[in-house]
Amino acid sequence: MNAYKHLIRPLLFKLNPEATHAMARALLRCPYSRRLFGGQGLFIHDERLRVNLGGLTISNPVGLAAGFDKDCDMVNSLMGLGFGYIVPGSVMYHPRPGNPCPRIIRDPEREAVYSCMGLPSRGLDYALKQLGRRRYSNVPLIINLNAENYDDYLKTFEALQPFGEALEITLYCPNRPNDAGDFLSPGVAERLLVEIVKRKKKPVFIKIPGYRSENERRKRLNLVEHILKFPLEGITITPESLVDEGRLSIGRGTVTGRPMFRQTLSVVRDVYRLTKDKWHIRASGGIFTSVDAFEAITAGASTVEIFTGFIYEGWCIARNINQGLLNLMKKFSIENVTALRGAELKIGTRLHGNGGESLIGAKQ
């Protein structure tokens, strides 16, 4: 029995989502929490899971996405939960409160979350202080940053670079007031990336949203083509999920969780066709199980990232996905995760029956 899903989660879900996160944050900031989780065998040590991600050696392809540890003050504990890497942030240069509450709504029936956080942050100085207290180096940190202008991007990038094994730059936020998405314009993005490359000493990944229409698709893939000109390591793909939601304080928000998985797969396929092996693709959106991870990697992702799945599945999610991936690779005679990447066309006829039903199994 999954103790988290059947005992702990029902109790936590009776609380306000932000109160629940505050409780989790308090626990994970505790110096002894790593010992609490460390005895549960959350790491799967197997060479078949190892990934080279833009020069970084990653022990497994399951990462914790940006947004859970916004201020980098839980990294010591999060590094003990079995993830191949952690993405703390988004770190902002200046402290900011984000949008007013309510700004998070759960949808348990769909295993989804609606949110309009608006990038709340304690600011760069606080994040640097917390990162300076990092005690472990067994799990890489890919620090995520965001900003409202060029100067803040560059100052935040330079300050964070010594503290992580890599950096991730998010080019927009759909729930931030007055964000017109200007950095998603190829010309504006190129101007920023010219300066980033001059300062770059670590691997750098760019995070952009997906798309829901053919017009958005053309624009986003055009942006990817422009970004490909730069000596960067990869791209993080998240679904485009902005919806009207009257229960949120600003009347709209993003959807994360299971409803977004098929869109994630579609975007990964498009970007993989465009980039091939030139770039690493990190898939983030609706990944809950090893079957989800398997599909995302065969579609072209190098790694997958968990956020909403962590909320619904609990602290064993990385272990469960990694163990399931090993089982699936054995079933389909795939040597390792690196060989699994982009293998969709090779094994596609064995993944689905004549009626399109999955032959993998519902959950692993």
Label for each model-derived stretch:
Residues 112-115, 121-138, 185-206, 252-279, ...:
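Alpha-helix-loop-beta-strand connector modules within alpha/beta enzyme cores
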Residues 66-69, 144-148, 208-214, 277-291:
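Glycine-rich beta-to-alpha transition loops that act as phosphate-gripper elements at the mouths
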Residues 1-140, 148:
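N-terminal capping/small domains of soluble enzymes
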Residues 61-63, 85, 140-144, 166-168, ...:
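Structural preference for beta-strand elements that scaffold enzyme active sites
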Residues 95-111, 244-257, 311-334:
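C-terminal helical cap(s) of enzyme catalytic domains, especially alpha/beta-barrels
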Residues 87-93, 170-175, 234-241, 287, ...:
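Glycine-rich phosphate-binding active-site loops on the catalytic face of alpha/beta enzymes
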Residues 29, 36-44, 111, 174-187, ...:
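Glycine/Thr-rich beta-alpha phosphate-binding loop at enzyme active sites
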Residues 73-78, 152-159, 213-229, 273, ...:
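Catalytic cores of alpha/beta
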